[in-house]
Amino acid sequence: MAAATRRVFHLQPCENSPTMSQNGYFEDSSYYKCDTDDTFEAREEILGDEAFDTANSSIVSGESIRFFVNVNLEMQATNTENEATSGGCVLLHTSRKYLKLKNFKEEIRAHRDLDGFLAQASIVLNETATSLDNVLRTMLRRFARDPDNNEPNCNLDLLMAMLFTDAGAPMRGKVHLLSDTIQGVTATVTGVRYQQSWLCIICTMKALQKRHVCISRLVRPQNWGENSCEVRFVILVLAPPKMKSTKTAMEVARTFATMFSDIAFRQKLLETRTEEEFKEALVHQRQLLTMVSHGPVAPRTKERSTVSLPAHRHPEPPKCKDFVPFGKGIREDIARRFPLYPLDFTDGIIGKNKAVGKYITTTLFLYFACLLPTIAFGSLNDENTDGAIDVQKTIAGQSIGGLLYALFSGQPLVILLTTAPLALYIQVIRVICDDYDLDFNSFYAWTGLWNSFFLALYAFFNLSLVMSLFKRSTEEIIALFISITFVLDAVKGTVKIFWKYYYGHYLDDYHTKRTSSLVSLSGLGASLNASLHTALNASFLASPTELPSATHSGQATAVLSLLIMLGTLWLGYTLYQFKKSPYLHPCVREILSDCALPIAVLAFSLISSHGFREIEMSKFRYNPSESPFAMAQIQSLSLRAVSGAMGLGFLLSMLFFIEQNLVAALVNAPENRLVKGTAYHWDLLLLAIINTGLSLFGLPWIHAAYPHSPLHVRALALVEERVENGHIYDTIVNVKETRLTSLGASVLVGLSLLLLPVPLQWIPKPVLYGLFLYIALTSLDGNQLVQRVALLLKEQTAYPPTHYIRRVPQRKIHYFTGLQVLQLLLLCAFGMSSLPYMKMIFPLIMIAMIPIRYILLPRIIEAKYLDVMDAEHRP
């Protein structure tokens, strides 16, 4: 059986698409002309009892193109002889046309369509049907019962048949293929991505007297085939074929499809409860679309669409004149963020879209994610500084710095934390003070003051613009370096536990104690004879095999510590991924995922503290400070020592500058859909002010933490799922940009000072090490460097269809990966060196990656391939 089938794709470029990629498909992003397609009307007269088939869509590659899919199929029956010879094969003819989004500002018909249809549109909320047939039948019955829809000559069965096209042999059963649909699709350099949560179906019929619209919202996402795996909304547009060009079914469908193409708008519709709220959301969306002056709605557009949204990356490298206006960036940041400051406290608390539950779970997550590393690094600083900076001071500094940043920062989603590189720097300062007989508190304070001075200069001269030179590949190297430091800290801590308990040190202490007891007994009197003395020696100096209890205790401690660490990692990561599982209710899955870290920490802390009481576990050291807020005597240092501190402060400022801006850039990434703007320069100045106070009082420094800040954004995000090639992908709809979560977490961290030493000492060190592994593992998601390293271990047939694999020769990919690994090893060699003075210059190695990327790598790999591999990948 043969069939003449036509499938029409309407393409529409994104609003921010400069030019198309060099792949030969398109050369620019201007609008393309299209012809009106009216041939589908003739099918009404030839409908019969045909079967149906499915068709696969074509893949279109290009940069930042969004297009609609309009499927229109026509059937011509053939004889059974052709069917027998063809073996049931059908022919599918595919063509593409461009369909622009409706411009609500310029096209008056868009307003009239929406206002007219809202008065009589049929809205079906919470539809429980699972099949497409049942959903459409429910919508048609609702349409027929509506008194405003007077269509006496309309045959619902014929109308139902008009919605589908048969494309198969009758004896093989019916597989429905919709005749005419519109579906939102975005095509970028990384491939094609369908908006699978909505589907607009078009039908024309001569018996209809006027146009009608029916919208159905499904209770649960339904899988209706390829590229329609998560459908929540169905828009049905019915119209007679003979209409003015501005009133056709296609124009009406284009109006509603334009509105539903906004992911934030679809989320609002999911939150409505009544038909009136549903229609109010439609009117509100029309008003937002009207306020947009040029082109379609940007993906970030939300309720406050008039907010100026600075770009995540500057399209061109900064010029010298960009750094000249003193304090210009700070003034612009304050002007951008200050008008929205009250909303940072009221969003999610006041209004319709409340998110109190999400705020509570996110606050608990941040509390544990900040407190436990603070305890771990505080314990490390206590060992490295001989108690000058201990756990108590580290918790106090974390609470104070976090509170100030949560209250006054321009981007409160960024989380400040003391980190492993800072602990390395503090250790270097202690070594220098011991070598040159300097007062640690004074030298530490001067180093921090110089660091803050340089950070303030960077902020006033707008040096954050330099971060636009950091490519994705450079960011991935630094991010992976941070993850490696977490893993290394966990491994080193576990090795220390095994060295202390599993191997000979525990027994050495045991023998020492027994020997001292023997000496004391031998001095009791000379009346003991030689045989008794020999017996005592033999008893107390027994071999290790004769001390089963002692040996068992030490080995049990080491093995249990390893199991506790791995168990914390396993439980935390399993719960973190639990929201992707099919078990339990979606709300329960989301809560378990948000509270994964607290649950894992509390569970294994209780297991180690109460389940194995007889086994000694390694705990962090706590020595309460008599005066934790004593100010350093900065005047006691000589001018030469102050000058030396300036050099250390400059190198430290490089680390702060890179970490702060890099993490802030990851938080403000376009895929996170933040709407309140950025404040790179002001946040850098605020960071300098905060660390000035911490330096004077001998508290540990803090800066933006990775991956805590991106995880904070993720915890506050509403996501929409889509299914492609059997994999579930999440797209962020919006993020609750609030100060309450980081503010609450900082308050809880400060109150934790009251929990020292008990019950915080119930948290053993292996749980802290498990936390480090959890943070390192979760930070690897989406890291292309890790994915490309994994390609070396896979056979070529198992390579994923990513954009760089399709567009870059395989050898070039491996060359680029190898060069990245070499840079990572160089960074690790300096940052993790056993020589203290080598650790000081690893921030310069980070800066050196900029000329390596722009000067050295293009000499080895073509620039066009480098640009592809540095592009964002969205599956």
UniProtKB/Swiss-Prot annotation:
Known catalysed reaction(s)? tetrahydroxoborate(in) + 2 Na(+)(in) = tetrahydroxoborate(out) + 2 Na(+)(out)
Record note on what altering residue 559 to M does: In FECD4; does not interfere with post-translational processing; the mutant protein partially localizes to the cytoplasm
Keyword Secreted, does the record have it?
no
The biological processes this protein is annotated with in GO are: bicarbonate transport; borate transport; cellular hypotonic response; cellular response to oxidative stress; fluid transport; intracellular monoatomic cation homeostasis; monoatomic anion transport; monoatomic ion homeostasis
The outcome of changing residue 224 to S is:
In FECD4; decreases cell surface expression; abolishes functional activity
Modification after translation is described as: Glycosylated.
Q: Which ranges sit in the Cytoplasmic compartment?
A: 1-358, 409-413, 468-475, 578-590, 659-683, 760-765, 811-815, 858-875
Point out the coiled-coil segments of this chain: none
PANTHER family documented for this protein: ANION EXCHANGE PROTEIN, SOLUTE CARRIER FAMILY 4 MEMBER 11
- Miscellaneous field: Isoforms 1 and 5 are produced by the usage of alternative translation start sites of the same transcript. There is no evidence for isoform 1 expression in cornea (at protein level).
Question: Its function?
Answer: Multifunctional transporter with an impact in cell morphology and differentiation. In the presence of borate B(OH)4(-), acts as a voltage-dependent electrogenic Na(+)-coupled B(OH)4(-) cotransporter controlling boron homeostasis. At early stages of stem cell differentiation, participates in synergy with ITGA5-ITGB1 and ITGAV-ITGB3 integrins and BMPR1A to promote cell adhesion and contractility that drives differentiation toward osteogenic commitment while inhibiting adipogenesis.
Q: What is this protein called?
A: Solute carrier family 4 member 11
Q: Which organism is it from?
A: Homo sapiens (Human)
**Encoding gene (name):** SLC4A11
